[in-house]
Amino acid sequence: GLGDVYKRQEVIGRNSANYVKYDPSYIYNSGLQTFGILRNPQLFELIYATSKHLHAQPQKYKSEDEDTANDSEEKNGLYQFCSFPVVDYDFTKACTIALTKEDKAFIVDHISKAKACQGTLLKYIVEHKELPLAKEFPGIDENLLPDELRIMQKRAQQFADFMYVVHLRYNCIYSEKNGIRDEKMFEKFSIEHDRFKHSGINIDDVLDMVTLRENSSKMFCREVAACLASDKIAELDDCIIRRERRVKGTRRKIGNQAYSYDPKYPVHNYKLSFRWETVRAFVDELRGKEASNG
């Protein structure tokens, strides 16, 4: 029943009572375009054009035993703006939100063929059902990956480690400027800072694989990495403070009396996982028992 859906840690029905930060339609629309299911971003214009085209055609009549709702049917001269799966339109049958064999084939086919998915870890995971996945990022034994993906995963892990050190230092500054110095946070930073210095991470190699919206983000990362490597903590703090002021403006927290540091809720006190938990839940559903409508 629906009660069981709420308890499942799956893509559909997961944490259903939680507040949604982003409009789901925005997220789904982006995903549909990425996987080539939605073939054009101008969806509403395409729907209007399709509707106008269909209404301009002579009315066709079908007998009662003919299929009257076949989304995959090609319309002459009509652009198919969306790729549709095979759907059973007999709504008198019992149905489920679990994936059917046809659903899975449709999803795998689109991920395998989508331009944005070529050379990605997601495509490799979907196409290799035998690949064991761990619950936490990085999630896959690097020895089981081809060289390009192994390096990509390693760089992602290094970027997560690097940003964790930066976030720890941010909280150190925030606690000192907006409340009481958080000694535990300073201890954490000291440990992770030392670990970073001995990790051999080359920030330029890492940034070569990171997609950032603007060059100033990469410049910030390089400046921070240099400060961490040379133990220039005062310069590091200044760099972080300037970055927040430039990006957040009046919404900045450091030095802003409208905010106070709470040691129970530090800012970004976690390592980036690149939404691995969602990927794992999605793949578990894809590999799980197939449902059948009816």
Which residue stretches match the model-derived regions?
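Short, small-residue-biased leader/transition segments that mark boundaries at the very start
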Residues: 2-6
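Short, cationic-aromatic polyanion-contact patches
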Residues: 43-68
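Leucine-rich, amphipathic alpha-helical/linker segments
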Residues: 61-141
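Short helix-coil junctions and helix-kink-helix linkers
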Residues: 8-22
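Short amphipathic alpha-helical interaction segments
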Residues: 18-35, 40-46
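Short, hydrophobic/amphipathic alpha-helical patches that form generic packing surfaces
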Residues: 30-35, 109, 123, 127, ...
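Mature, well-folded catalytic/scaffold domains that follow N-terminal targeting or propeptide regions
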Residues: 1, 33, 40, 134-137
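Long, contiguous all-alpha helical interaction modules
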Residues: 1, 147-294
